[in-house]
Amino acid sequence: MVAGSIARSYGGLSTFASMLSSSTLFAIAFAIALLSPVLGTAQTRPAERIVAGFDSTRPAERRQHRPAPLKELRDDIDALLSTPEWHGAHVGVCVMSLDGGELIYRRNDDALFTPASVQKLFTTAAALAIFGPEHSFSTTLSLDGTLLPSGEFVGNVILKGGADPTWSAAFGVDAAAMFDEWADVLDSLGIRSIKGNIIGDDDMFDDVAYAPGWAWDDLPWSYAPQVGPLALYDNAVAVSVTHPGLDAEPPQVRLHPETEYVRVIPSIRVLDSTGVTALTPLRDPSSNVIELNGTLAGITTSDTVTVRLSVDNPTAYTLWHFRAALQRRGIRFRGALLDIDDVNDVSPDERTQVVIEHSSMPLRNIVAVINQTSHNLGAEMLLKAMGWQQGQGSWDRGVDVIKAVLRREGVGSGMAIADGSGLSRLNLCTPHQVATLLARANKASWGAAFKASLAVPGQVGTLRRRMIGSRAEHAVRAKTGSMNNVSTLAGYVTTRDGEAFAFSIMLGNFIAPQSMAHNLQDLVCMRLASFSRKLGQ
């Protein structure tokens, strides 16, 4: 068991807590959780005797006085949540058995919390329910004009966005290679030059680039990108700054992907290896001129730091890179890159021909990337796509769709939803609502895809460094959430008996380090994974 079990051997938790500091309590609890047996009964006894309070020689009859397993579990979780680090903080937990919905543990489970990226559970569940796991998003390239015998195409090339978030390395897609293939298609049609415009059709969504409640100081960063139905490279650019070594030169700045769409103005002071690297980007939300200020520490040209920053106007960014692919293929272009809103008449007529229709990977794969890596742009595009299906690609309409799905699934309506990713602090929900969603999803037709989308400890994703070596490593699938003074974790855990629980752990208004919040959540998961309803197990 964990800290609570140890405390009882000292005559009660309050006595034990007075004897040890909170950090010591956590260290002991963590060590004991790691000692939790993973295999058969023959290997479990020594660890269980240690957990019971180091009394390996106590008479067998004393086991009869142990609390019932469920009470012992609750006492242990109470002990973990009662250390000084969480005094004054907002702490909520809900653990629910998937067999009949029994509430295994609850603390402040009906209080409202900021969910951070756990919000993505609502978004991805609703998307799977609305579209289905095999749904894909289509982007088209159309020609509206005439191809002359000389190989010159006179007219417009129209790139129409279909809410596909996958054109980036995060989804395993080489967007540059994809555009090169598109240029090859145009070349195969005999097009050697284009006299006209390349038009980006982004009318599937409204023109509101940011969700309500996003902080202004988040906007320069890649995790707070502008949202539209045309998205490329996560609507961001990576800026790498390399130390000049011993040369008295400024640091070298490179962009990936290489682009002239963004201009970086560096103001970086070079330090030796005893210094601290700290880079701060400044970008007006309507500009692609980035001021990069700060310091770069190191002594060799291998000392490089990379920051990922958002770009303004994702539609224009996409068109710029498509034009670059045409130029690489040798297709000359005479015209402008335009948003469809800046064109008087682009209504399809008999000349308009769709020459490329690109379909994304299935939604089940998209939500896996969104939940495992906490991909904000993908979540926001799903929200607006759901709104579009119901008549308007906006945050308001997308939120309405999500709420309707949650009501239908019995999750309830007493929550505030502002965006799809959880970046907004205007989102509010309860631990019970999150656990209920997980329980309902478990029985839904799309539930297998939803569960498979969650991160697993030790594997690719936001849990890759957590719970490793413990029983929970192979028993937990969950979604993380994190922002200043907020840390959340919600998902599924399988107990030692094979019983499945849905759980939600939500922490807010705390000043402890995020690492300590993660440790607390991990310890609760370890304790749940080691739970058995069999007395004495």
Task: Give each language-model segment a name.
Residues R106-A126, V367:
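Short active-site loop at a secondary-structure junction
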Residues N108-F113, R308, S421-S424:
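A short glycine/serine-rich beta->alpha loop
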Residues S22-P37:
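Bacterial N-terminal signal peptides
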Residues S82-R107, L338:
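A short, well-structured edge-of-sheet supersecondary motif
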Residues Q43-T83, A129-G412, N519, R527-Q537:
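Conserved serine DD-peptidase/penicillin-binding transpeptidase domain
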